[in-house]
Amino acid sequence: MNKIVLCLLVFCVAHSAAYDLLKAPSYFEDFLHKFNKHYSSESEKLRRFQIFQHNLEEIIIKNQNDTTAQYEINKFSDLSKDETISKYTGLALPLQTQNFCEVVVLNRPPDKGPLEFDWRRLNKVTSVKNQGICGACWAFATLASLESQFAIKHNQLINLSEQQLIDCDYVDAGCNGGLLHTAYEAVMQMGGVQAENDYPYEGSDGNCRVDVAKFVVKVKKCYRYIAVFEEKLKDLLRIVGPIPVAIDASDIVNYRRGIMRYCSNYGFNHAVLLVGYGVENNVPYWILKNTWGEDWGEQGYFRVQQNINACGIRNELLASAEIY
């Protein structure tokens, strides 16, 4: 077969724009099998199909309108947007807040840096994790940045314990949500954080079992950033390291690949890690690490267009920390 024809066939099969709303029942049965979905009753199955059909319609519209990204049926496709956000994100204002972190206003014009930069290429980013049904994105994003700080300083990748923060951070609310800077403050108050192997992830709230003798990372100081110019995040990323950021995750749920040019910003509900940036077909983009597993997006990552405040990425909830 002609190689060009073969490539076109592969592209057509792979591209989610090929979805047909009339085939929703067939897609749904495939979805049930692929993701091993089971429901308590036929009425619940019907309800889930109706949600699935609504999500499929949204996926088709997105694939028609967003020419630089692709969207697909995935493990969240039988959940409403509100369900996905409530179960799989977790950025929320704690009942009590503190202010240990120094506030830095990024109001100077950006420097002339490289067009592309990616901390993954320098082997300073740990593997993608999966928070599961626990609203602890705040813990994953903050500790992912500390993991990178440790790798930058000691040239060694180590996985830290999100479960320690979920169980022992009494400012944030465990699987019910938290913030980025308050998580850093909690690590400072506790004195450090253990490795994941010593305090494994359980995906639910538990009793604090912290062992100070097993701390592997200690935080010296934390910072909150107010970015006046989105472009300035490039300088911050290169100088500081991977940065946890707050976003609105509503539009990334059914993301598959490419650069998202349309991502709403109706309120922050999720935290992810900014690890790099680049340009593809003259479209500048940010690279972000998510916590929904490697079977989501671009092996757990996603890209959004720069300088349009995609998903609300430019906000006052940016944070980072300096380790000993």
Swiss-Prot record:
Residues of the active site: C137, H270, N290
Post-translation changes: Synthesized as an inactive proenzyme and activated by proteolytic removal of the inhibitory propeptide.
Official protein name in the record: Viral cathepsin
SUPFAM superfamilies, alphabetized: Cysteine proteinases
Gene Ontology terms: biological process: proteolysis
Proregion positions: 19-113
CDD domains assigned to the protein according to its UniProt record, in alphabetical order: Peptidase_C1A (cd02248)
